[in-house]
Swiss-Prot record:
<dbReference type="GO" id="GO:0005524">
    <property type="term" value="F:ATP binding"/>
</dbReference>
<dbReference type="Pfam" id="PF01202">
    <property type="entry name" value="SKI"/>
</dbReference>
<comment type="subunit">
    <text>Monomer.</text>
</comment>
<dbReference type="InterPro" id="IPR000623">
    <property type="entry name" value="Shikimate_kinase/TSH1"/>
</dbReference>
<feature type="binding site">
    <location>
        <position position="140"/>
    </location>
    <ligand>
        <name>substrate</name>
    </ligand>
</feature>
<keyword id="KW-0460">Magnesium</keyword>
<feature type="binding site">
    <location>
        <position position="82"/>
    </location>
    <ligand>
        <name>substrate</name>
    </ligand>
</feature>
<keyword id="KW-0067">ATP-binding</keyword>
<feature type="binding site">
    <location>
        <position position="60"/>
    </location>
    <ligand>
        <name>substrate</name>
    </ligand>
</feature>
<feature type="binding site">
    <location>
        <position position="120"/>
    </location>
    <ligand>
        <name>ATP</name>
    </ligand>
</feature>
<feature type="binding site">
    <location>
        <position position="157"/>
    </location>
    <ligand>
        <name>ATP</name>
    </ligand>
</feature>
<keyword id="KW-0028">Amino-acid biosynthesis</keyword>
<keyword id="KW-0479">Metal-binding</keyword>
<dbReference type="InterPro" id="IPR027417">
    <property type="entry name" value="P-loop_NTPase"/>
</dbReference>
<dbReference type="GO" id="GO:0008652">
    <property type="term" value="P:amino acid biosynthetic process"/>
</dbReference>
<dbReference type="GO" id="GO:0009423">
    <property type="term" value="P:chorismate biosynthetic process"/>
</dbReference>
<dbReference type="GO" id="GO:0005829">
    <property type="term" value="C:cytosol"/>
</dbReference>
Length: 173
């Protein structure tokens, strides 16, 4: 089995970070964290509310602090928020404190996976979701690529299949 080192999942919304992260943690008998869920737990409010009240900048400040604390732990799987990589500090911490896995997917898959999810503040706007996702991809994909140790496409694969691919890649490195 892969040694117990931190595994950090990055990628766009709808790539499957939380679902795959839970599966991966279960298979490796590691503790799982989701940075968005941790923010919700600490604030007692959902991410959308935090965005509405504090704005994206306030949310990103919280996210940076949460990810800093979580990445200091050992032997965890962490699903990060899609925009967490906007922070250079967060990118540096993720790179230094574990293996970064970029879960890549298409805009079409993102649209299919997020269309009924009202907990995506960046999609609760007047612009068409495709345009929002394309703009986010243009901004963030280079940042995911910059820190990724491993990149895996998640398009038509189950969480278990992707988790197994990650485990196999970790064991071969």
């Amino acid at each position: 089995m892969a040694e117990k080192r931190n595994i950090f999942l990055v990628g766009p919304m709808g790539a499957g970070k939380s679902t795959i992260g839970r599966q991966l943690a279960q298979q490796l008998n590691m503790e799982f964290f989701d940075s968005d869920q941790e923010i919700e737990r600490r604030t007692g409010a959902d991410v959308g509310w935090v965005f509405d009240v504090e704005g994206e900048e306030g949310f990103r400040d919280r996210e940076e602090k949460v990810i800093n604390e979580l990445t200091e732990k050992q032997g965890i799987v962490l699903a990060t928020g899609g925009g967490s990589v906007k922070s250079r500090e967060t990118r540096n911490r993720l790179s230094a404190r574990g293996v970064v896995v970029y879960l890549e997917t298409t805009i079409e898959k993102q649209l299919a996976r997020t269309q009924r999810d009202k907990k995506r503040p960046l999609l609760q706007v007047d612009e068409p979701p495709r345009e929002v996702l394309e703009a986010l991809a243009k901004e963030r994909n280079p940042l995911y690529e910059e820190i990724a140790d491993v990149t895996i496409r998640t398009d038509d694969q189950s969480a278990k299949v992707v988790a197994n691919q990650i485990i196999n890649m970790l064991e071969s490195n």
